Protein backbone atom coordinates (compact mmCIF):
# COMPACT_ATOMS: atom_id res chain seq x y z
CA UNK A 1 0.00 0.00 0.00
CA UNK A 2 1.44 3.35 -1.09
CA UNK A 3 0.83 6.25 1.29
CA UNK A 4 0.18 9.53 -0.53
CA UNK A 5 1.90 12.82 0.26
CA UNK A 6 -1.33 14.21 1.72
CA UNK A 7 -1.68 11.21 4.06
CA UNK A 8 1.89 11.67 5.27
CA UNK A 9 1.09 15.32 5.89
CA UNK A 10 -2.05 14.43 7.84
CA UNK A 11 -0.25 11.82 9.95
CA UNK A 12 2.58 14.23 10.70
CA UNK A 13 0.21 17.09 11.60
CA UNK A 14 -2.04 14.92 13.77
CA UNK A 15 0.96 13.46 15.63
CA UNK A 16 2.44 16.93 16.17
CA UNK A 17 -0.93 18.20 17.39
CA UNK A 18 -1.44 15.34 19.86
CA UNK A 19 2.14 15.41 21.20
CA UNK A 20 1.93 19.13 21.97
CA UNK A 21 -1.56 18.86 23.45
CA UNK A 22 -0.64 15.87 25.62
CA UNK A 23 2.57 17.49 26.89
CA UNK A 24 0.76 20.76 27.56
CA UNK A 25 -1.86 18.97 29.68
CA UNK A 26 0.85 17.09 31.63
CA UNK A 27 2.69 20.35 32.25
CA UNK A 28 -0.44 22.05 33.57
CA UNK A 29 -0.96 19.13 35.97
CA UNK A 30 2.70 18.97 37.00
CA UNK A 31 4.68 22.18 36.44
CA UNK A 32 7.92 20.40 37.32
CA UNK A 33 7.65 18.59 34.00
CA UNK A 34 7.84 21.86 32.03
CA UNK A 35 11.61 22.03 31.50
CA UNK A 36 11.83 18.55 29.92
CA UNK A 37 8.59 19.16 28.02
CA UNK A 38 10.01 22.40 26.64
CA UNK A 39 12.90 20.56 25.01
CA UNK A 40 10.58 17.87 23.61
CA UNK A 41 8.18 20.27 21.91
CA UNK A 42 11.08 22.44 20.68
CA UNK A 43 12.59 19.44 18.89
CA UNK A 44 9.16 18.44 17.59
CA UNK A 45 8.68 21.98 16.22
CA UNK A 46 11.84 21.75 14.14
CA UNK A 47 11.02 18.25 12.89
CA UNK A 48 7.47 19.22 11.97
CA UNK A 49 8.57 22.29 10.00
CA UNK A 50 11.26 20.35 8.11
CA UNK A 51 8.94 17.43 7.30
CA UNK A 52 6.11 19.64 6.02
CA UNK A 53 8.50 21.65 3.83
CA UNK A 54 9.92 18.43 2.36
CA UNK A 55 6.46 16.94 1.78
CA UNK A 56 5.21 20.04 -0.03
CA UNK A 57 8.24 20.29 -2.29
CA UNK A 58 7.06 19.73 -5.85
CA UNK A 59 8.56 22.18 -8.32
CA UNK A 60 11.01 23.45 -5.70
CA UNK A 61 11.45 24.43 -2.07
CA UNK A 62 9.97 27.90 -2.62
CA UNK A 63 6.19 27.52 -2.53
CA UNK A 64 3.36 29.07 -0.47
CA UNK A 65 3.27 26.30 2.15
CA UNK A 66 7.04 26.60 2.64
CA UNK A 67 6.70 30.35 3.10
CA UNK A 68 3.93 29.79 5.66
CA UNK A 69 6.15 27.46 7.70
CA UNK A 70 9.15 29.78 7.34
CA UNK A 71 7.06 32.72 8.54
CA UNK A 72 5.99 30.91 11.71
CA UNK A 73 9.43 29.48 12.40
CA UNK A 74 11.53 32.61 11.88
CA UNK A 75 9.08 35.21 13.17
CA UNK A 76 7.81 33.21 16.18
CA UNK A 77 9.50 29.89 16.98
CA UNK A 78 13.20 30.39 16.32
CA UNK A 79 14.01 32.21 19.54
CA UNK A 80 12.32 29.87 22.08
CA UNK A 81 13.51 26.81 20.12
CA UNK A 82 17.12 28.04 19.88
CA UNK A 83 17.39 28.53 23.65
CA UNK A 84 15.37 25.44 24.61
CA UNK A 85 18.28 23.46 26.13
CA UNK A 86 19.13 26.18 28.65
CA UNK A 87 15.84 28.01 28.92
CA UNK A 88 16.21 28.83 32.62
CA UNK A 89 19.53 30.57 32.05
CA UNK A 90 18.41 32.27 28.84
CA UNK A 91 14.95 33.57 29.74
CA UNK A 92 16.10 37.14 29.14
CA UNK A 93 17.19 36.17 25.63
CA UNK A 94 13.75 34.76 24.79
CA UNK A 95 11.70 37.49 26.49
CA UNK A 96 13.86 40.59 26.34
CA UNK A 97 11.56 43.05 28.10
CA UNK A 98 8.65 43.11 30.51
CA UNK A 99 7.62 43.26 34.15
CA UNK A 100 8.24 39.67 35.19
CA UNK A 101 9.40 36.77 33.02
CA UNK A 102 7.65 33.51 33.82
CA UNK A 103 9.39 30.38 32.51
CA UNK A 104 6.18 28.34 32.63
CA UNK A 105 4.34 30.83 30.43
CA UNK A 106 7.22 30.79 27.96
CA UNK A 107 6.62 27.05 27.59
CA UNK A 108 2.85 27.49 27.38
CA UNK A 109 3.32 30.11 24.67
CA UNK A 110 5.42 27.77 22.55
CA UNK A 111 2.81 25.00 22.86
CA UNK A 112 -0.01 27.43 22.06
CA UNK A 113 1.72 28.32 18.79
CA UNK A 114 2.45 24.70 17.85
CA UNK A 115 -1.10 23.43 18.39
CA UNK A 116 -2.82 25.96 16.06
CA UNK A 117 -0.01 25.46 13.52
CA UNK A 118 -0.72 21.71 13.39
CA UNK A 119 -4.46 22.41 13.30
CA UNK A 120 -3.96 24.81 10.38
CA UNK A 121 -2.12 22.17 8.33
CA UNK A 122 -4.88 19.63 9.08
CA UNK A 123 -7.56 22.10 7.97
CA UNK A 124 -5.48 22.86 4.89
CA UNK A 125 -5.38 19.14 4.01
CA UNK A 126 -9.13 18.75 4.45
CA UNK A 127 -9.92 21.68 2.13
CA UNK A 128 -7.12 21.21 -0.41
CA UNK A 129 -8.98 18.97 -2.87
CA UNK A 130 -12.07 21.17 -3.04
CA UNK A 131 -10.06 24.37 -3.29
CA UNK A 132 -7.88 22.93 -6.05
CA UNK A 133 -10.99 22.22 -8.15
CA UNK A 134 -12.20 25.77 -7.48
CA UNK A 135 -8.87 27.23 -8.59
CA UNK A 136 -9.07 25.19 -11.79
CA UNK A 137 -12.24 27.11 -12.71
CA UNK A 138 -10.63 30.57 -12.51
CA UNK A 139 -11.02 32.64 -15.69
CA UNK A 140 -8.23 33.55 -18.09
CA UNK A 141 -7.27 37.19 -17.45
CA UNK A 142 -4.57 37.60 -20.08
CA UNK A 143 -5.09 40.86 -22.00
CA UNK A 144 -3.19 44.09 -22.53
CA UNK A 145 -3.37 47.71 -23.63
CA UNK A 146 -0.11 49.31 -24.70
CA UNK A 147 -1.14 52.86 -23.81
CA UNK A 148 -1.76 52.06 -20.15
CA UNK A 149 1.68 50.43 -19.84
CA UNK A 150 3.11 53.98 -19.68
CA UNK A 151 2.05 54.00 -16.03
CA UNK A 152 5.26 52.03 -15.45
CA UNK A 153 7.08 55.36 -15.71
CA UNK A 154 4.97 56.77 -12.90
CA UNK A 155 5.82 53.75 -10.80
CA UNK A 156 9.51 54.38 -11.40
CA UNK A 157 9.10 58.04 -10.42
CA UNK A 158 7.32 57.15 -7.16
CA UNK A 159 10.00 54.53 -6.44
CA UNK A 160 12.74 57.12 -6.85
CA UNK A 161 10.93 59.55 -4.54
CA UNK A 162 10.45 56.83 -1.91
CA UNK A 163 14.09 55.75 -2.01
CA UNK A 164 15.37 59.33 -1.80
CA UNK A 165 13.09 60.20 1.12
CA UNK A 166 13.95 56.91 2.86
CA UNK A 167 17.65 57.66 2.50
CA UNK A 168 17.11 61.04 4.18
CA UNK A 169 15.29 59.25 7.03
CA UNK A 170 18.16 56.74 7.11
CA UNK A 171 20.57 59.58 7.87
CA UNK A 172 18.30 60.74 10.70
CA UNK A 173 17.96 57.17 11.99
CA UNK A 174 21.72 56.93 12.38
CA UNK A 175 21.57 59.86 14.78
CA UNK A 176 18.49 59.08 16.88
CA UNK A 177 17.74 55.25 16.89
CA UNK A 178 14.49 53.50 16.08
CA UNK A 179 13.02 54.01 19.57
CA UNK A 180 12.38 57.64 18.60
CA UNK A 181 10.87 56.81 15.21
CA UNK A 182 7.50 58.49 15.75
CA UNK A 183 9.01 61.65 17.17
CA UNK A 184 11.11 62.17 14.03
CA UNK A 185 8.51 60.98 11.52
CA UNK A 186 10.65 58.15 10.18
CA UNK A 187 7.61 56.35 8.78
CA UNK A 188 5.75 59.34 7.32
CA UNK A 189 6.78 58.73 3.70
CA UNK A 190 5.80 55.06 3.33
CA UNK A 191 2.80 55.92 1.15
CA UNK A 192 5.19 56.55 -1.75
CA UNK A 193 5.95 52.84 -1.79
CA UNK A 194 2.25 52.02 -1.97
CA UNK A 195 1.78 54.39 -4.91
CA UNK A 196 4.70 52.87 -6.80
CA UNK A 197 3.53 49.31 -6.11
CA UNK A 198 0.02 50.00 -7.42
CA UNK A 199 1.50 51.58 -10.55
CA UNK A 200 3.58 48.47 -11.16
CA UNK A 201 0.55 46.24 -10.65
CA UNK A 202 -1.52 48.26 -13.13
CA UNK A 203 1.34 48.19 -15.60
CA UNK A 204 1.63 44.42 -15.20
CA UNK A 205 -2.09 44.03 -15.86
CA UNK A 206 -2.34 46.19 -18.97
CA UNK A 207 1.07 46.01 -20.63
CA UNK A 208 2.11 43.50 -23.26
CA UNK A 209 5.23 42.44 -21.35
CA UNK A 210 3.89 40.48 -18.36
CA UNK A 211 7.30 39.66 -16.92
CA UNK A 212 6.72 38.78 -13.25
CA UNK A 213 10.46 38.65 -12.55
CA UNK A 214 10.87 42.21 -13.83
CA UNK A 215 7.98 43.60 -11.78
CA UNK A 216 9.03 41.65 -8.68
CA UNK A 217 12.51 43.12 -9.09
CA UNK A 218 11.14 46.65 -9.41
CA UNK A 219 9.04 46.28 -6.27
CA UNK A 220 11.94 44.69 -4.37
CA UNK A 221 14.29 47.55 -5.33
CA UNK A 222 11.65 50.02 -4.16
CA UNK A 223 11.20 48.11 -0.88
CA UNK A 224 14.85 48.77 -0.02
CA UNK A 225 13.46 52.04 1.28
CA UNK A 226 11.81 50.04 4.07
CA UNK A 227 15.08 48.61 5.31
CA UNK A 228 16.58 52.11 5.25
CA UNK A 229 14.04 53.25 7.85
CA UNK A 230 14.43 50.10 9.96
CA UNK A 231 11.54 47.99 8.63
CA UNK A 232 13.61 45.17 7.20
CA UNK A 233 10.81 42.59 7.39
CA UNK A 234 8.98 44.15 4.43
CA UNK A 235 12.12 44.21 2.31
CA UNK A 236 12.71 40.53 3.10
CA UNK A 237 9.11 39.69 2.11
CA UNK A 238 9.47 41.34 -1.30
CA UNK A 239 12.91 39.77 -1.70
CA UNK A 240 11.32 36.34 -1.30
CA UNK A 241 8.68 37.30 -3.86
CA UNK A 242 11.48 37.94 -6.36
CA UNK A 243 13.18 34.66 -5.41
CA UNK A 244 9.91 32.80 -5.92
CA UNK A 245 9.54 33.89 -9.54
CA UNK A 246 13.24 33.32 -10.19
CA UNK A 247 12.81 29.79 -8.84
CA UNK A 248 9.76 29.22 -11.06
CA UNK A 249 11.84 30.01 -14.13
CA UNK A 250 15.33 28.81 -13.22
CA UNK A 251 14.76 26.17 -10.49
CA UNK A 252 17.27 27.62 -8.04
CA UNK A 253 19.45 25.09 -6.24
CA UNK A 254 19.40 24.87 -2.45
CA UNK A 255 23.03 26.06 -2.17
CA UNK A 256 22.12 29.36 -3.86
CA UNK A 257 19.10 29.78 -1.60
CA UNK A 258 21.30 29.25 1.47
CA UNK A 259 23.82 31.76 0.13
CA UNK A 260 21.06 34.33 -0.34
CA UNK A 261 19.79 33.62 3.19
CA UNK A 262 23.24 34.22 4.71
CA UNK A 263 23.65 37.40 2.66
CA UNK A 264 20.25 38.71 3.78
CA UNK A 265 20.93 38.00 7.47
CA UNK A 266 24.35 39.67 7.27
CA UNK A 267 22.91 42.81 5.68
CA UNK A 268 20.06 42.77 8.23
CA UNK A 269 22.62 42.59 11.02
CA UNK A 270 24.50 45.62 9.73
CA UNK A 271 21.29 47.61 9.40
CA UNK A 272 20.17 46.56 12.87
CA UNK A 273 23.36 47.98 14.39
CA UNK A 274 22.76 51.24 12.56
CA UNK A 275 19.06 51.25 13.43
CA UNK A 276 19.50 50.81 17.19
CA UNK A 277 22.61 52.94 17.34
CA UNK A 278 24.79 50.39 19.16
CA UNK A 279 26.82 47.30 18.23
CA UNK A 280 24.64 44.28 19.02
CA UNK A 281 26.56 41.55 17.18
CA UNK A 282 30.13 40.35 17.51
CA UNK A 283 31.95 37.93 15.22
CA UNK A 284 30.73 36.16 12.10
CA UNK A 285 28.38 33.79 13.95
CA UNK A 286 26.82 36.69 15.80
CA UNK A 287 26.27 38.56 12.55
CA UNK A 288 24.54 35.51 11.03
CA UNK A 289 22.53 34.14 13.98
CA UNK A 290 21.56 37.22 15.99
CA UNK A 291 19.40 38.78 13.24
CA UNK A 292 17.50 35.48 12.98
CA UNK A 293 16.91 35.42 16.73
CA UNK A 294 15.87 39.07 16.67
CA UNK A 295 13.29 38.26 13.98
CA UNK A 296 11.68 35.96 16.55
CA UNK A 297 10.62 38.98 18.59
CA UNK A 298 6.97 38.32 17.75
CA UNK A 299 7.10 35.40 20.20
CA UNK A 300 7.14 38.05 22.92
CA UNK A 301 3.71 39.26 21.83
CA UNK A 302 2.39 35.68 22.06
CA UNK A 303 3.81 35.41 25.57
CA UNK A 304 2.26 38.76 26.50
CA UNK A 305 -1.15 37.87 25.08
CA UNK A 306 -1.21 34.59 27.00
CA UNK A 307 0.15 35.77 30.35
CA UNK A 308 -1.65 39.13 30.50
CA UNK A 309 -4.85 38.20 28.69
CA UNK A 310 -7.19 39.87 31.19
CA UNK A 311 -5.24 43.14 31.14
CA UNK A 312 -5.34 43.20 27.36
CA UNK A 313 -9.10 42.54 27.31
CA UNK A 314 -9.58 45.48 29.68
CA UNK A 315 -7.44 47.66 27.38
CA UNK A 316 -9.14 46.80 24.09
CA UNK A 317 -12.61 45.29 23.69
CA UNK A 318 -13.69 43.08 20.81
CA UNK A 319 -15.72 46.02 19.51
CA UNK A 320 -12.60 48.20 19.51
CA UNK A 321 -10.62 45.46 17.77
CA UNK A 322 -13.08 44.96 14.91
CA UNK A 323 -14.64 48.41 14.47
CA UNK A 324 -12.09 51.04 15.57
CA UNK A 325 -8.47 51.87 14.87
CA UNK A 326 -7.34 51.06 18.41
CA UNK A 327 -4.03 49.18 18.34
CA UNK A 328 -3.96 45.79 20.07
CA UNK A 329 -0.16 45.72 19.83
CA UNK A 330 0.08 48.77 22.09
CA UNK A 331 -2.24 47.10 24.60
CA UNK A 332 -0.04 43.99 24.66
CA UNK A 333 3.04 46.13 25.21
CA UNK A 334 1.35 48.14 27.97
CA UNK A 335 0.08 44.97 29.68
CA UNK A 336 3.60 43.57 30.01
CA UNK A 337 5.25 46.91 30.67
CA UNK A 338 7.30 47.54 27.54
CA UNK A 339 5.42 50.31 25.74
CA UNK A 340 7.65 52.63 23.72
CA UNK A 341 5.66 55.81 23.12
CA UNK A 342 7.94 57.15 20.39
CA UNK A 343 8.52 53.99 18.35
CA UNK A 344 10.18 50.59 18.53
CA UNK A 345 7.19 48.72 19.98
CA UNK A 346 6.72 44.96 19.56
CA UNK A 347 3.35 45.52 17.84
CA UNK A 348 1.07 42.49 17.42
CA UNK A 349 1.19 39.12 15.67
CA UNK A 350 -1.06 36.46 14.17
CA UNK A 351 -0.88 34.13 17.18
CA UNK A 352 -1.16 36.81 19.85
CA UNK A 353 -4.44 37.97 18.29
CA UNK A 354 -5.55 34.35 18.03
CA UNK A 355 -5.10 34.03 21.80
CA UNK A 356 -6.82 37.37 22.42
CA UNK A 357 -9.93 36.47 20.42
CA UNK A 358 -10.31 33.03 22.01
CA UNK A 359 -10.73 29.58 20.54
CA UNK A 360 -14.19 30.03 18.98
CA UNK A 361 -13.37 33.05 16.84
CA UNK A 362 -9.80 31.78 16.54
CA UNK A 363 -10.92 28.44 15.10
CA UNK A 364 -13.01 30.22 12.47
CA UNK A 365 -10.01 32.40 11.64
CA UNK A 366 -7.77 29.32 11.29
CA UNK A 367 -10.35 27.68 9.01
CA UNK A 368 -10.38 30.76 6.77
CA UNK A 369 -6.60 31.03 6.86
CA UNK A 370 -6.20 27.37 5.88
CA UNK A 371 -8.63 27.91 2.99
CA UNK A 372 -6.65 30.96 1.83
CA UNK A 373 -3.38 29.02 2.09
CA UNK A 374 -4.84 26.11 0.11
CA UNK A 375 -6.06 28.59 -2.51
CA UNK A 376 -2.62 30.13 -3.04
CA UNK A 377 -0.85 26.74 -2.88
CA UNK A 378 -3.24 25.37 -5.52
CA UNK A 379 -2.35 28.32 -7.77
CA UNK A 380 1.31 27.41 -7.36
CA UNK A 381 0.62 23.81 -8.35
CA UNK A 382 -1.24 25.00 -11.45
CA UNK A 383 1.80 27.11 -12.38
CA UNK A 384 4.09 24.08 -12.07
CA UNK A 385 1.69 22.00 -14.15
CA UNK A 386 1.48 24.67 -16.87
CA UNK A 387 5.07 25.92 -16.60
CA UNK A 388 5.58 25.78 -20.39
CA UNK A 389 2.48 27.88 -21.09
CA UNK A 390 2.92 31.37 -19.61
CA UNK A 391 -0.43 32.59 -20.92
CA UNK A 392 -2.34 29.69 -19.34
CA UNK A 393 -0.60 30.20 -15.98
CA UNK A 394 -0.93 34.01 -16.00
CA UNK A 395 -3.94 34.21 -13.66
CA UNK A 396 -2.25 31.94 -11.12
CA UNK A 397 0.99 33.93 -11.27
CA UNK A 398 -0.95 37.14 -10.78
CA UNK A 399 -2.70 35.80 -7.67
CA UNK A 400 0.59 34.71 -6.11
CA UNK A 401 2.24 38.00 -7.08
CA UNK A 402 -0.43 39.85 -5.10
CA UNK A 403 -0.76 37.46 -2.14
CA UNK A 404 2.70 36.07 -1.43
CA UNK A 405 4.24 39.05 0.45
CA UNK A 406 1.35 38.97 2.94
CA UNK A 407 1.79 35.21 3.41
CA UNK A 408 5.53 35.55 3.99
CA UNK A 409 4.85 38.17 6.66
CA UNK A 410 1.65 36.66 8.08
CA UNK A 411 3.03 35.44 11.44
CA UNK A 412 4.06 38.99 12.31
CA UNK A 413 0.92 40.67 10.97
CA UNK A 414 -2.65 40.75 12.24
CA UNK A 415 -4.86 37.66 12.39
CA UNK A 416 -7.02 38.59 9.40
CA UNK A 417 -4.38 40.28 7.22
CA UNK A 418 -3.70 37.38 4.83
CA UNK A 419 -7.34 36.27 4.87
CA UNK A 420 -8.64 39.69 3.84
CA UNK A 421 -5.89 40.02 1.22
CA UNK A 422 -6.98 36.77 -0.45
CA UNK A 423 -10.63 37.89 -0.25
CA UNK A 424 -9.80 41.20 -1.95
CA UNK A 425 -7.78 39.35 -4.59
CA UNK A 426 -10.77 37.09 -5.30
CA UNK A 427 -13.03 40.14 -5.70
CA UNK A 428 -10.37 41.82 -7.83
CA UNK A 429 -10.06 38.77 -10.08
CA UNK A 430 -13.84 38.69 -10.48
CA UNK A 431 -13.95 42.38 -11.40
CA UNK A 432 -11.01 42.03 -13.78
CA UNK A 433 -12.72 39.11 -15.49
CA UNK A 434 -15.77 41.29 -16.15
CA UNK A 435 -13.57 44.10 -17.52
CA UNK A 436 -11.78 41.65 -19.82
CA UNK A 437 -15.07 40.20 -21.05
CA UNK A 438 -16.40 43.70 -21.87
CA UNK A 439 -13.12 44.66 -23.59
CA UNK A 440 -13.20 41.55 -25.78
CA UNK A 441 -16.83 42.20 -26.77
CA UNK A 442 -16.00 45.79 -27.72
CA UNK A 443 -13.05 44.57 -29.78
CA UNK A 444 -15.29 42.10 -31.63
CA UNK A 445 -17.79 44.86 -32.43
CA UNK A 446 -15.06 46.92 -34.08
UniProtKB/Swiss-Prot annotation:
Keywords annotated in UniProt: Cell inner membrane, Cell membrane, Lipopolysaccharide biosynthesis, Membrane, Transferase, Transmembrane, Transmembrane helix
Molecular functions per Gene Ontology: transferase activity
Pathway(s) served: Bacterial outer membrane biogenesis; LPS O-antigen biosynthesis
E.C. number: 2.4.99.27
UniProt key word Aminoacyl-tRNA synthetase: no
Reaction catalyzed: n lipid-linked O-antigen repeat units = a lipid-linked O antigen + (n-1) polyisoprenyl diphosphate
Membrane topology: Multi-pass membrane protein
Localisation: Cell inner membrane
Residue ranges crossing the lipid bilayer per the database entry: 11-31, 33-53, 58-78, 104-124, 147-167, 186-206, 211-231, 252-272, 355-375, 391-411, 415-435
UniProt record, GO biological process: lipopolysaccharide biosynthetic process
Gene Ontology CC terms: plasma membrane
Biological role stated in the UniProt entry: Polymerase involved in the biosynthesis of the lipopolysaccharide (LPS). Catalyzes the polymerization of the O-antigen repeat units on the periplasmic face of the inner membrane, leading to the formation of the lipid-linked O-antigen molecule. In vitro, shows a preference for bacteria-based, undecaprenyl-containing substrates rather than eukaryote-based, dolichol-containing substrates.
Designated name of the protein: O-antigen polymerase
Species of origin: Escherichia coli
Gene label: wzy
Amino acid sequence: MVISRSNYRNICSYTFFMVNLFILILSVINEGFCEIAYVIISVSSVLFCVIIICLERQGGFLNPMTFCIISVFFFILIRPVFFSQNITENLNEVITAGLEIDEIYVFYSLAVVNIPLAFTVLLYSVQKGTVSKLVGQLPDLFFYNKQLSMILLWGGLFSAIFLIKSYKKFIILGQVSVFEADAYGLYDELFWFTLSKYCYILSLLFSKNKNFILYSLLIFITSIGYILVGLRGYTIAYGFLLLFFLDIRYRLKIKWLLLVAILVTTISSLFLNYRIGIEVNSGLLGIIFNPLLQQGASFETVYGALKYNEKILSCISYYDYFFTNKDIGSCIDIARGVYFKEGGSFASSFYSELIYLGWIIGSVALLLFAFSLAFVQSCYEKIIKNSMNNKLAYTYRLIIFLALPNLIYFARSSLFDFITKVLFIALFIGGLSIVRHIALNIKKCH
